[in-house]
Amino acid sequence: MDVIIIGAGVIGSAIAYYLSRKGIGATVIERCDTACAASGKSGGFLARDWCVGQPQDQLAQLSFDLHTDLTDALATDYGYRRVDTYAMALSDRRSFARGTGLSTAVNWLNNEGVVHKLLGDTTTTAQLHPERFTRALLTAACTAGAQLRLGTVESIERDPVKNQVSGITVDGRFLSADAVVIAMGPWSLLATQWLPLPAIYGLKGYSITLSPNTPVTADALFLDYEDQLGERHGPELIPRADGEVYLCGFSGDDPLPVSPEDVSIDDTACNRLRVLAGRVSTVLAEATVVQHQACYRPICEDAMPVVGAIQGTRGAYVATGHNCWGMLNAPGTGLAMAELISDGQASSIDLAPFAPDRLPPLRQ
């Protein structure tokens, strides 16, 4: 069976990995590089039970458990570890009483904010380095028969008689396929010109990574931050196993560029994050800035993933729209998609809540 996956982010790489476990060596097409967009610039935070009562709950719990299995199966260090996770309040307009809340639980924080709730412990929350994890998945897939090919997809070809995909055109060359999977993150929007897909949008966010002189503990922080204007933000601060600290929290409204290579970085937004880091911790105030980053998270109209077969064209599939939970839900998505493609149905989870045709196609 010839399978082509368009996109070498974490979702496409996970699908390639689980297909390889079934003896199917997919061809992964990527315009830029592995994990070149959000899959290389996310926080890599994982939570098992933060979607309880929502359609994503089954997917999240399956994926969290698969992450544990993958630490042994991939046999490479990508910074996976369990963490404690706290909620913290911080304001530029008012102060909090010293010693309140759970602030003493995280010993590298200043006294300006208040840690007021344990959101998860080492049984329910974890963290990894997103780019290294994505590369580990794709490397394992390629070792088992998959291949990565750099190029720009120009069209998806269909056999009108059989009403089935026949392949794709990449940089002017036709590649035949029995199945084609759209896993291009927010750039899956480009595929709406070839297939009846719903609109996929890109939400832009900024992040920085810091290298502190003093190591910090494995405690993730989700902030409720009030700025001088009274606006509320939700920064996330994720220490990594390699000693770096990741911080995100401000968004932008720039339109999605044609290529991930053209994503612009707003240094003003990143510098705001730098100042915020210093408010949270003196250790972070003295840290070296390693990177300023920006990326677009894929999201659709109802903020749910779009995963499954594309109606009307046999052999056409899509897996995108995971928003901020792509790194978490990649293993479950990859496993279910591999089952759907190879066996005709997903047996690990019910994909019905994520069916592409639950939403109207962008192009009628």
Language model features by range: what are they?
Residues S281-Q364:
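C-terminal catalytic lobe of FAD-dependent flavoproteins
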Residues D2-T27:
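N-terminal Rossmann-like FAD-binding beta1-loop-alpha1 element of flavoenzymes
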Residues G9-V10, D33, P186, C324:
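Residue-level detector of alpha-helix initiation sites
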Residues Y18-R21, R31-T85, R94-S103, Q228-G230:
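Conserved FAD-binding subdomain of flavin-dependent enzymes
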Residues L128-V216:
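Predominantly flavin-linked oxidoreductase catalytic cores and closely associated redox partners
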Residues Y17-R21, G44-L46, Y78-R81, A179, ...:
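Active-site substrate-recognition segment that forms the wall
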Residues D69, D77-L150, S155-Q164:
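Flavin (FAD/FMN) cofactor-binding and adjacent substrate-gating region
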